[in-house]
Amino acid sequence: MRVDAFDFDLPSERIALRPARPRDAARMLVVDAGNIVDAGVRDLPQWLRPGDCLVFNDTRVIPAQLEGLRGEAKIGATLHKRIDLRRWQAFVRNAKRLRVGETVDFGSGVAALAEERLADGSFVLAFAGDEPVELLLERAGTMPLPPYIAGKRGADEADRDDYQTMFAREDGAVAAPTAALHFTPELLAALAAAGIATETLTLHVGAGTFLPVKADDTDDHVMHAEWGRIEADTAARLNAVRASGGRVIAVGTTSLRLLESAARDDGTITPFAGDTSIFITPGYRFKAIDGLMTNFHLPRSTLFMLVSALMGLETMQAAYAHAIAREYRFYSYGDASLLLPRQSGRSRTLS
């Protein structure tokens, strides 16, 4: 499909720079088949059924944004993907001033060697010393806010909490699974009281999630890879949910992408550990999920393509036009949407 089919105009004032407080006070646009309903995140239990299961991503965002010097040249780096204990793939700003074999001093006793430059222009950075890289980042790094926020304000101490979900426990993400930012202990208690189950998986969200689609056609876009894991007991419980008539609702596109990566053609979810570069566009045959809770996404982005695949492009265009007109808050710190497609069997294709 043409990428420009997924374009729309978003007024800049609709971009949220801070989250709702409390978190579950955010608004939620429900798209139930073709119906569009204004609601709030706290209404979520009313839109689900006893026996349904919400699936969260438990990745933890690390302070992966670094600023340093190579001699007198200022070098910025956003860590993207862990390679091993000491090496990370990173997107580098002012990359023309950095060559393979040179060292960047990030301050606070943190330095890294530019070990290799990859075909996509990113670098492999090898960190010096024996301390775990995650500890080095706590000293020298800042939270890697999305560019549409960072372009308007710098990261601050509040973001260390605001840009972390209550489920975060597995270090490795450089972007938050933002749909889960809306959840609070009180909301989880209400969901449990309504008979809604919860499960977790891990997908370490990379900085590639913010990369623009430069191709003119979706067939020509190369999707970034991210590492994920679904434990065997988690997969078994999710399969039991669907076998008993419950629905699997992914909380966030990261959870959805990993579940779909781990699913067989018959919809059975299998244990998974490895990279996924799944790219979901209209015409995709969904296998593992029955709904999605997600924030509002950028025009022309792979994530708007994903929700259009789930609900239909015309439906999502109408939903986003409604959200803009009703002044919903967009993107990572913004409001939520709950997408419930028409059910047509366990595996289905929507376009």
From Swiss-Prot:
The keyword S-adenosyl-L-methionine applies. The lineage of its organism: Bacteria, Pseudomonadati, Pseudomonadota, Alphaproteobacteria, Sphingomonadales. One of its GO terms (cellular component) is cytoplasm. HAMAP family: QueA. This is S-adenosylmethionine:tRNA ribosyltransferase-isomerase. It catalyses: 7-aminomethyl-7-carbaguanosine(34) in tRNA + S-adenosyl-L-methionine = epoxyqueuosine(34) in tRNA + adenine + L-methionine + 2 H(+). The keyword Nucleotidyltransferase does not apply. It holds the Pfam family Queuosine_synth. The gene is queA. Its EC number is 2.4.99.17. Transfers and isomerizes the ribose moiety from AdoMet to the 7-aminomethyl group of 7-deazaguanine (preQ1-tRNA) to give epoxyqueuosine (oQ-tRNA). GO terms for molecular function: S-adenosylmethionine:tRNA ribosyltransferase-isomerase activity. Belongs to the QueA family. It is an enzyme of class 2 (transferase). Pathway: tRNA modification; tRNA-queuosine biosynthesis. Monomer. InterPro entries: QueA (IPR003699), QueA_dom1 (IPR042118), QueA_dom2 (IPR042119), QueA_sf (IPR036100). It comes from the Bacteria. Keywords: Cytoplasm, Queuosine biosynthesis, S-adenosyl-L-methionine, Transferase. GO terms for biological process: queuosine biosynthetic process; tRNA wobble guanine modification. It is found in: Cytoplasm.
